[in-house]
UniProtKB/Swiss-Prot annotation:
Pfam families: CN_hydrolase, LNT_N. Belongs to the CN hydrolase family. Apolipoprotein N-acyltransferase subfamily. Pathway: Protein modification; lipoprotein biosynthesis (N-acyl transfer). GO terms for biological process: lipoprotein biosynthetic process. It is a multi-pass membrane protein. Signal peptide: none annotated. It is found in: Cell inner membrane. This is Apolipoprotein N-acyltransferase. GO terms for cellular component: plasma membrane. It comes from Rickettsia felis (strain ATCC VR-1525 / URRWXCal2) (Rickettsia azadi).
Length: 496
């Protein structure tokens, strides 16, 4: 039995390549083997082992880049690198193992493959919220290389798209069992479903050109290395780099800086002077990431990762506090038990903010703010576009260098635009900054490691809410019924 276990591990590693930036889509067929070997297992323990080994390989190759972030401060956190590289895949593999274990109990069911797909998506959903959640690289994101293929997000969301991807990916599993009638049914249904997705996406995009508001926005990407970002000696150089990229002879309404672009309070006299001079010369409003230090009692402070807006009259127009914090990065879970400090700068943990929406009165602009990885949580972001005009997502992917991480983060984030029918303005210190329309199309873009700015008009939101934004994950139930009906009809046709 060692051979199937090794195969599962290797195929799991190959399957991690289906995501950005490689998008090696043929690797999705590795899931057909997993589906087969789980059904072939002699007991649930064996099925769990196969699923675990596949899952470990899957996450090892898919999110290896997290260890690069830990290595930024290698002198302090060298010990954490193996935990980041291997520890997270060791934990996350349990979700795939659990889905395989549950599927095993349906091994003799006529609809085993269908149940396998349901179990996979079920545990993707569980992964999105348990232990604060990490819905990174859900299998549906394998289709995010194509604007056409992600249009169904507006109806079924990312978990629905995951179901379709896993269904298509496991359609070849009867080949291993030489069950050719079932193979014909699954392949035919997969081709039909994929055709529906392609036709729907193509028609939706061709019938809906991007419409724009009158609000011009400038995205500033300084690409400051993480080793220099919190260096006090580099502070003024970094600030002036932001300002120089922001100032331009072309008029703009909004200037947007990235997560934690201001690492000191904006009311420090010299900092304030430089900011106001820039805002007066551009006649724009600055939306920036920063650190909010609210005094609690005496000398005790509460730190928040914030997004706020400043105008040329030194008025703070709104302030948003990040509510979905990164464990181990922005705070230490189980701090009384674990004798470690968080991996990011500073000794004080960030506090969880209230989240919510903000409003920019001058432009009558209702904003859904997202800081960093808040954008990876579909249920957290899900918003009726009748009460929101635009998503503004600020982030800092400089931690992860030229790895897969920043590319994956961008494609995950833009999926939220399609789900909610809202444009997204995404600004990274380093990473991928972009203006994205409500169909997920990239209008303007700055690439990884690019030191520059780009600007354009904010796209208009859709005229009506998307089905997903109104009903959420309940639409997956309709999808399941739809695919079951297709299978039933194809079985009637192909069996005769």
């Amino acid at each position: 039995m060692y051979k199937p276990k090794i195969i599962c591990l290797l195929l799991g590693m190959l399957s991690g390549l289906v995501f950005a930036p490689t998008f090696f889509i043929p690797a999705l067929l590795t899931l057909s083997y997993l589906c087969y070997i789980v059904q072939k297992s002699e007991n649930w323990q064996e099925a769990a082992k196969f699923g675990y080994l596949f899952g470990f390989g899957h996450f090892l190759s898919g999110i290896y880049w997290i260890s690069i972030g830990v290595s930024v401060y290698i002198a302090d956190f060298w010990w954490a690198i193996p935990f980041a590289l291997f520890g997270l895949p060791i934990v996350l593999a349990f979700f795939i193992s659990a889905s395989c274990t549950l599927s095993f109990f349906a091994k003799n069911n006529k609809y085993y493959q269908f149940i396998f797909c349901i179990c996979w998506v079920l545990f993707e959903w569980v992964r999105s919220w348990i232990f604060t959640g990490l819905p990174w690289n859900l299998i549906g994101y394998a289709f995010s290389f194509s604007d056409i293929l992600i249009q169904t997000l507006s109806i079924i969301g990312i978990y629905g798209l995951s179901f379709i991807v896993i269904y298509i990916s496991t359609s070849a599993y009867p080949l291993f069992r030489k069950q050719f009638t079932q193979l014909k049914i699954l392949l035919a249904s997969s081709v039909l479903i994929l055709s529906v997705i392609v036709i729907y996406g193509a028609v939706r995009l061709s019938n809906n050109p991007t419409n724009f508001t009158d609000i011009k926005v400038r995205l500033v990407q300084p690409s400051i290395p993480q080793t220099e970002k919190w260096n006090e000696e580099e502070f003024w150089h970094n600030l002036m780099l932001h300002i120089n990229l922001s100032e331009n002879s072309e008029p703009t309404d909004l200037i947007i800086w990235s997560e934690a672009a201001l690492i000191v309070p904006d009311d420090i006299p010299q900092v304030k002077s430089e900011l106001l001079q820039m805002l007066n010369s551009t006649n724009a409003i600055l939306i920036t990431g920063g650190i909010s230090d609210n005094k609690k009692q005496g000398d005790e402070f509460e730190l928040y990762s914030a997004m706020y807006a400043l105008d040329k009259n030194d008025h703070k127009l709104f302030e948003y506090h990040k509510s979905h914090l990164v464990p181990f990065g922005e705070y230490m879970p189980l701090k009384k038990i674990l004798p470690f400090k968080k991996l990011t700068h500073g000794l004080i943990d960030y506090k969880e903010g209230d989240g919510g929406l903000v409003y920019l009165e001058k432009y009558n602009l209702k904003i859904k703010p997202l800081i960093c990885y808040e954008s990876i949580f579909p249920d957290f972001v899900r918003t009726n576009n009748e009460i929101v005009d635009v998503i503004i997502n600020i982030t800092n992917d400089a931690w992860y260098g030229k790895s897969s991480g920043p590319y994956q983060h961008f494609h995950i984030s833009r999926s939220r635009a399609v789900e909610n029918g809202l444009p997204m303005i995404r600004v990274a210190n380093n990473g991928i900054s972009a203006i994205v329309d409500p169909f997920g199309r990239t209008i303007e873009k700055l690439n990884l490691n690019e030191i520059n700015y780009t600007q354009g008009l904010i796209p208009k939101k859709l005229n009506s809410p998307t089905i997903f934004s109104q009903f959420g994950n309940f639409t997956i139930l309709l999808l399941i019924v739809f695919i079951l009906l297709i299978n039933y009809l194809l079985a009637l046709i192909l069996d005769n």
